[in-house]
Curated annotation (Swiss-Prot):
UniProt protein name: Uncharacterized protein MG255 homolog
Membrane-spanning ranges: 149-169, 185-205
Domain of life of the source: Bacteria
Transmembrane helix keyword on record: yes
Major location category of this protein: membrane
GO terms under cellular component: plasma membrane
Topology relative to the membrane: Multi-pass membrane protein
Keywords: Cell membrane, Membrane, Transmembrane, Transmembrane helix
């Protein structure tokens, strides 16, 4: 039976989907918590072509460059040529060609292969031609940018060129007698040039306006064009024949559904391809679904939300797990990096029970932080502080040893985190991967600035590869420095309220406010924390 937590989370998601002014990509589904975290990591790394080599090699550089400057919020900003190619590639893998039945003779199958390839190439060319017109001819932006110049040139031609030319011709004799032949020639050339400039500007504006009207019409009808192509050249499975709207490209308010099986080897590539495609449009994405629970959505959520789109599915087979909530928050990271001044992350760290989960989650956070171009205020819990320290430019081994020696946890916290054996995890990484291990991985922040004497440089010479790899401890001087630093901060923590401890740390140009929340205050709200900091 559904819980209130399920209903509230669904309402949150559908509210995001109905917010057409600020589209969101929301991932919410899947079986297996480790697989969820892994998928999030791949999703965050979609800038790297290693995950989507087959379709996005030429597409990614332009996408990254444009997205970092100004994210694509409208359909007109999309790279339509690549969208067409990606859409056709997705459709070609998931749909069957129309009017083609598999023959019994194997040799006929071989004959059909080149025919299908040629038809697919022809269809790609046809779709790409439509999209190329929209993508490469920036008529709308041209008119908007050049409007003042064109207006000025037309004004010069009409208000100056024509009167001067008329006066010059009518008073030709007087001008020649009083100003000379040179002045007469200058006035004639100037007036003719001004008139010609005005005429050319008028023609440019007229032609641009016509193309602008055509471009606007193309933008408005893109989803209809694709719909006709899909209906003509592709057919759906029997269970999807009445749901072709999912695969249509629209300007606003569309939620795409794409299901995949975590057991399939290609599920990451397939999901990445579709998400990259949809990222270029002003659409919403909901990935991984089950039809069996649509009744819950329609009965419990849709009446309250006034949901406009009906082809939405969520996997509610089990109760919404804490890791699903992590997914919900993390997928908003990119929007926050561009728009928000503050980001609040609940203490999800206690929910990660294995070294694999905890390290994957760290990678997810670090990758997101790289997209922040302005100083941000981030909120984390007590163990997230530990995690961030491990994930930054500190030597991992120094941090782990010092943490065990100088940072104390309550008995309850020890119970919560006892199952996470990070020391063993990093030891294995060091032993198996040597200089490619996590210990030597270049990280995001340079934290040596505020306590430079503390950390010793770990090199491969310190490690005997024939024996069990061990973390190299700090020297005495460095330990004492680190101890003094930690003790100072602990004293600061102890002066705060027991239930809402606050600690801030400056790393480079970024300031991290680390909210230390006890277990029973896990759901502390951002507003309360801000009021407390004042």
């Amino acid at each position: 039976m559904e819980t209130q937590n399920q209903i509230e989370t669904l309402r949150y998601i559908f509210n995001q989907l109905n917010n057409q002014d600020k589209p969101q990509i929301i991932w919410f589904s899947g079986e297996g918590e480790d697989e969820k975290i892994n998928f999030l990591i791949r999703l965050d790394n979609y800038f790297q072509p290693t995950f989507v080599q087959d379709l996005t090699i030429n597409f990614l550089p332009a996408f990254v460059k444009r997205n970092k400057k100004n994210p694509p919020n409208t359909l007109a900003k999309g790279n339509f040529v690549n969208i067409a190619n990606k859409l056709l590639a997705v459709l070609a893998r998931s749909l069957s060609w129309k009017q083609l039945n598999k023959p019994q003779q194997k040799w006929l199958l071989w004959l059909l292969v080149p025919f299908l390839l040629l038809r697919q190439l022809w269809l790609k060319k046809k779709v790409s031609k439509i999209f190329q017109f929209v993508n490469e001819r920036g008529i709308l932006s041209f008119i908007k940018e050049q409007w003042p110049i064109l207006t000025t040139l037309v004004t010069v031609g009409t208000t100056l060129g024509t009167p001067i030319f008329s006066i010059t011709i009518s008073q030709q004799k007087a001008i020649l007698e009083n100003a000379g032949h040179g002045a007469f020639v200058f006035l004639v050339i100037f007036s003719v040039f001004a008139i010609a400039l005005g005429l050319v500007s008028s023609l440019i504006f007229l032609v641009s306006s016509l193309f602008s009207i055509r471009q606007k019409k193309s933008l408005q009808q893109l989803h209809q064009i694709l719909s006709r192509l899909i209906n003509k050249y592709f057919c759906f499975a029997n269970s999807e024949q009445n749901q072709t709207g999912r695969y249509q490209l629209k300007n606003t308010g569309v939620c795409f559904f794409y299901g995949f099986d975590f057991e399939e080897k290609e599920y990451i590539t397939q999901a990445m391809n579709l998400l990259l495609l949809l990222k270029q449009t002003n659409c919403f994405v909901l990935v991984g679904c089950k039809e069996s629970n649509m009744l819950l959505i329609k009965n419990k959520v849709e009446p309250d939300i006034n949901l406009k789109q009906s082809s939405l599915y969520l996997d509610l087979k089990s109760q919404i797990s804490p890791l699903a909530q992590i997914s919900k928050y993390n997928l908003l990271f990119e929007e926050l990096a561009l728009d928000a001044d503050m980001f609040y992350l609940e203490d999800f760290f206690a929910l990660l029970k294995t070294p694999r989960q905890i390290v994957n989650f760290l990678f997810r956070i670090k990758q997101n932080l790289k997209e922040f171009h302005q100083p941000q205020t981030l909120w984390f819990d007590y163990l997230a502080l530990w995690a961030l320290v491990i994930a930054t430019d500190f030597e991992f081994n120094n941090v782990l040893w010092s943490f065990n020696d100088y940072l104390s946890l309550t008995n309850k916290q020890k119970e919560d985190y006892a199952s996470v054996n990070l020391t063993a995890f990093f030891n294995r990484s060091l032993k198996n991967h040597k200089d490619n291990s996590l210990l030597f991985k270049p990280e995001l922040f340079n934290t040596h600035a505020y306590i430079p004497e503390t950390y010793t440089q770990v090199t491969l010479e310190n490690i005997d590869s024939d024996k069990r790899a061990q973390l190299v401890p700090l020297n005495w001087f460095s330990q004492q420095k680190f101890s003094d630093f930690i003790e100072e901060k602990i004293n600061f923590w102890q002066t705060q309220q027991a239930e809402n401890k606050v600690f801030y740390l400056t790393l480079g140009e970024r300031i991290f406010f680390l909210v230390l929340v006890n277990k029973k205050f896990k759901q502390i709200k951002l507003e309360a924390a801000l009021k407390y900091l004042n």
